[in-house]
Amino acid sequence: FPKALEMIDQEAFSGCNTLTEIDFSKATQLRSIGHRAFYECSGLRDLDLSACTSLVGIGSNAFYRCSNLQAVNFSGCGKLTSIGSYAFQYCSSLRTVDLSNCSALVTLESYVFSDCSNLTSVGLAGCTALTTIGEGAFNNNYSSSQLSDFDFSQLTALKDIGESAFSNSALAGDIAFASGITQLGRNAFSGCRNITSVDF
């Protein structure tokens, strides 16, 4: 994509299931990716948005059921404020999500990474504005591997974890929350069989 691109509108590439690669390396002015923009692009394998330094929002269902997508990199997206509902739901091959240095990110909407059954790594370092993890955001991520690096303690602004946000997920090890947490929703961590301790 060229540097001048500012918006990818809804359903722009929806259903392009032979699309295997998207080059965002020059898209430094891109501000938004719309609803269902890359919906069911099942051939897509890697998504590197780290050069998209102007990106503010990703719409609902934007990358829904991109079933061969393995890695998502948001590490340079310092202006990103929200990732919409169902944006990456059913990305069943997704293993790593890098949200490090997304310092403006406030909300992970409902079911955003739900049913990503191979998810093993979510990088959150620098997500200092994240206040809400929505309903079902990471539920049903029951991979054979363990999601052991999800560090709640560095989410210093986090207040609300929604209903079923991590139910039946691969969260593992010790869970420690920062002092600002005020609400854990119904069934927020139900079925997390590999959690060994919780520290409030």
Where on the chain are the PLM-derived regions?
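Structural signature of tandem-repeat unit edges
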Residues: 1-7, 17-32, 42-57, 67-82, ...
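Consensus positions within tandem repeat domains that build extended binding/scaffold surfaces
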Residues: 9-14, 34-39, 59-64, 84-89, ...
